[in-house]
């Protein structure tokens, strides 16, 4: 009897010890993964049918970079790696969907300098993100002067005959005027719509277009069985990354490159998005 009881207690102690060892090992593994993932840029590639895209532009290559957050939480090496891989793909067009710095204007110049290896034949088009609005005009100017980025702030540009890029101010920190942004576009134009915050897609759900966004970091820390964390300004929005349909518009949310709040990513590596556009 005593022996049986003692064996049972010993087994229970062993099981508890094993449980804590496994739990500790899992925690260490997740922490290690969180430290590693911010340094490993994942490339996602898609063929995307764009309504009203001229057939002469079928196969156009577009790279999307978003949320580099140059600052103390995102190593420059990660941003440079994303830029290097984008440049190696030789895109026809690069679109930048905001949050170039964490907060500090002093990071804008170095951030713009890191974009200079990109030389797409149709140029680089950018919008601002909510983190850029402490110094929006100065950050936009740095990106234009140093890297040649054409910044859209409730505006649109025809980058090739019959193909446009429209972009709005940030939905949290900026003053959005989507009517002004879309005013230059013919009703039958093929176009991409740039909105830092994915909620901006609601403003173009009546138009046939592809919308590109960032802001979410894909949740940044994605633990099994735990709902992802949505950043400010997305209350009630049903999607945190990937593709979705909103009326006539299709939306892609990139996980972005950088980090905020924590220098960690878990089950959510940084992303470079490469899109090959197809005439529909």
Protein language model annotation of sequence segments:
Residues 50-63, 149, 157-166, 245-250:
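Beta-strand-turn-beta hairpins that frame and shape the catalytic cleft
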Residues 60-147:
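Membrane-embedded segments
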Residues 198-273:
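Conserved beta-sheet core of the metallophosphoesterase superfamily
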Residues 4-26, 30:
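N-terminal secretory signal peptides and thylakoid transit peptides that target proteins
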Residues 141-142, 146-149, 155-156, 160-195, ...:
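Binuclear metal-dependent hydrolase catalytic cores centered on His/Asp/Glu-rich metal-binding motifs
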Residues 59-69, 162-170, 192-196, 250-255:
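Active-site-proximal beta-strand elements of phosphoester/diester hydrolases
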Residues 65-66, 94-98, 124-130, 152, ...:
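Active-site neighborhood of phospho(di)ester-bond hydrolases with catalytic His/Asp-centered motifs
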Residues 12, 31-63, 75-77, 84:
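C-terminal segment of N-terminal export signals and the immediately downstream linker at the start
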């Amino acid at each position: 009897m005593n022996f049986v009881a003692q064996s049972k207690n010993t087994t229970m102690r062993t099981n508890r010890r094993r449980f804590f060892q496994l739990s500790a090992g899992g925690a260490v593994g997740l922490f290690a993964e969180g430290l590693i993932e911010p340094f490993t840029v994942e490339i996602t590639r898609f063929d995307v049918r764009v309504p009203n895209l001229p057939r002469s532009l079928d196969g156009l290559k577009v790279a999307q970079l978003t949320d580099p957050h140059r600052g103390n939480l995102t190593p420059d090496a990660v941003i440079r790696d994303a830029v290097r891989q984008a440049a190696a793909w030789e895109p026809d067009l690069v679109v930048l969907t905001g949050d170039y710095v964490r907060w500090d204007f002093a990071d804008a110049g170095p951030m713009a300098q890191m974009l200079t290896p990109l030389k797409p034949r149709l140029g680089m088009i950018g919008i601002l993100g909510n983190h850029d609005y402490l110094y929006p005009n100065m950050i936009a100017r740095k990106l234009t002067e140093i890297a040649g980025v054409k910044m859209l702030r409730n505006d649109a540009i025809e980058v090739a005959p019959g193909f446009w890029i429209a972009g709005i101010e940030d939905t949290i920190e900026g003053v959005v005027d989507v009517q002004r942004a879309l005013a230059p576009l013919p009703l039958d134009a093929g176009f991409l719509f740039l909105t830092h915050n994915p909620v901006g897609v609601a403003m173009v759900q009546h138009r046939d277009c592809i919308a590109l966004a960032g802001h979410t970091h894909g949740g940044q820390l994605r633990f099994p069985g735990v709902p992802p964390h949505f950043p400010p300004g997305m209350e009630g929005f049903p999607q945190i990354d990937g593709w979705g349909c909103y009326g006539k518009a299709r939306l892609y949310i990139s996980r972005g490159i950088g980090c905020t709040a924590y220098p960690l990513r878990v089950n959510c590596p940084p992303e470079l998005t490469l899109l090959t556009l197809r005439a529909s």
